[in-house]
């Protein structure tokens, strides 16, 4: 039986992170202010999460919401935030910088990738702002990043599945392609079947705590995603070389 795909869950609070782990999440993307797509979590949130969670944690490195081109001062801030993530034992970092022309800023991203070593690096959904995603894939590979989080250039992942499949084929094991952007229990099976990716990302619509202040609904949503991935792993043929990544963090 094929091993099930990895599930990464994005969260903005310690309580949500703990609920995600209880639900079976394999990896946590730690952010704050997910309403703007996520920004760098505070040092205190990193410390608290690391103290309570054994699963891999990737910290968002994003000084603000909005466009993905940054001033020199913001770039320096990102460097400091990467150092903070390393000193607080994060397993990876998540960032993405574009030029004013809307291309991958290879030099700036490569500098941050080098600074982040030995942490894994995810190039986030700034990738979906690119005009040519296949050219962008080659540019991100040139930066030394580990994986790309993408919805295939569409607002919703289910509308970008054909493009994600092309990216997986072109990457051919050189880069982990991480589908995300609106993944829910209702559409995950289709995303899995049409992409056969080895990892998937969801925030479950950033479900809020219930009236008792708990994250039971969030935990149950994560568990539903895990169960779907387990079911799909029993139904799918072994992954092709284009989908094998050999990396699980």
Set out the residue ranges of the language-model regions.
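Active-site mouth loops of central-metabolism enzymes
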Residues: 2-12, 61-79, 98, 122-133
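N-terminal pre-domain/capping segments
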Residues: 2-28, 33-40
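Hydrophobic faces of well-ordered beta-strands that scaffold small-molecule active sites
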Residues: 5-9, 28-30, 57-61, 93-95, ...
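Active-site-adjacent beta->alpha loops and helix N-cap segments on the catalytic face
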Residues: 15, 34-55, 73-76, 97-117, ...
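Catalytic cores of alpha/beta
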Residues: 15-19, 69-81, 128-143, 167-169, ...
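A structural motif
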Residues: 25, 54, 89-91, 118, ...
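Ordered, amphipathic secondary-structure segments that act as subunit-interaction surfaces
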Residues: 80-97, 104
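Short, low-complexity, charge-dense intrinsically disordered segments
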Residues: 237-249
């Amino acid at each position: 039986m094929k091993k099930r795909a990895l599930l990464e869950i994005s969260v903005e609070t310690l309580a949500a992170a703990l609920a995600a782990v209880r639900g079976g999440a394999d990896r946590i993307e730690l952010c704050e202010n997910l309403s703007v797509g996520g920004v760098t979590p505070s040092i205190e949130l990193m410390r608290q999460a690391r103290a309570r969670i054994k699963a891999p944690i990737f910290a968002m490195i994003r000084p603000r919401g909005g466009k993905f081109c940054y001033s020199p001062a913001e770039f320096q801030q990102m460097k400091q935030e990467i150092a903070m993530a390393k000193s607080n034992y994060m397993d990876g970092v998540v960032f993405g910088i574009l030029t004013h022309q809307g291309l991958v800023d290879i030099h700036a991203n490569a500098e941050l990738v080098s600074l982040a070593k030995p942490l894994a690096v995810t190039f986030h959904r700034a990738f979906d702002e690119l005009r040519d995603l296949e050219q962008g894939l080659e540019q991100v590979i040139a930066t030394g990043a580990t994986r790309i989080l993408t919805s295939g250039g569409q607002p919703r992942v289910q509308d970008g599945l054909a493009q994600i499949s092309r990216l997986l084929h072109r990457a051919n094991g050189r880069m982990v392609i991480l589908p995300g952007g609106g993944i829910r229990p209702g559409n995950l099976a289709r995303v899995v079947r049409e992409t056969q990716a080895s990892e998937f990302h969801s925030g479950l619509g950033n479900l809020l705590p219930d009236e008792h202040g708990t994250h039971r609904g969030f935990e149950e949503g994560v568990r539903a995603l895990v169960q779907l991935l387990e079911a799909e792993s029993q139904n799918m043929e072994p992954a092709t070389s284009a989908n094998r990544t050999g990396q699980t963090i």
